[in-house]
Amino acid sequence: MNLKQIDTIKEKIQPILSEKHLLLWDLSFFGGSPAVLTILIDGQDHQAIRMNQISEVTSLISDALDKVEPDPFPDRYNLDISSPGIDRSIKTDEHLDWALGQPIKLNLFEKIDGSKSAEGILKSFSDLEISLEVSPAEVKNFPREKISKISLNQEA
């Protein structure tokens, strides 16, 4: 699936989510047999969502996607709609902005200070780095190009 198709899907589902006072957290597509379209949704102001909301939105989104032309899914696929969960992945600057002041975990491509991960309170971020308060008196900066994954860390 290409970026244009993903944008088309986002355009189709965004009004549905807005009407139901929900936010799109993430969207991913994995080819396979069958392929899987995963849509992660969250409540406005990042409030918890209920299963009945997920069920209702799944039906509405499925109907909307069935009407997209040209069909982005000519073959069979599974639609998976769920909450991003408490240890949600943080992928965009919007996600980082939301996570400011919260505990996060970084997975790194290579060791920094002897470790391939870091945990702390997200203090700030820029295009180049992410700053974590790793202890009450210590803030460390991590280059974004060395970070493989960022997630909320509710275990902290």
UniProtKB/Swiss-Prot annotation:
Coiled coil ranges: none
| Keyword set includes Cytoplasm | yes
Provide one Gene Ontology cellular component. Answer: cytosol
Keyword Cytoplasm in the entry? The reply is yes
- Assigned keywords, A-Z: Cytoplasm, Ribosome biogenesis
- Compartment list: Cytoplasm
Q: What does this protein do?
A: Required for maturation of 30S ribosomal subunits.
What's the family? Answer: Belongs to the RimP family.
Q: What is this protein called?
A: Ribosome maturation factor RimP
| Organism per entry | Oenococcus oeni (strain ATCC BAA-331 / PSU-1)
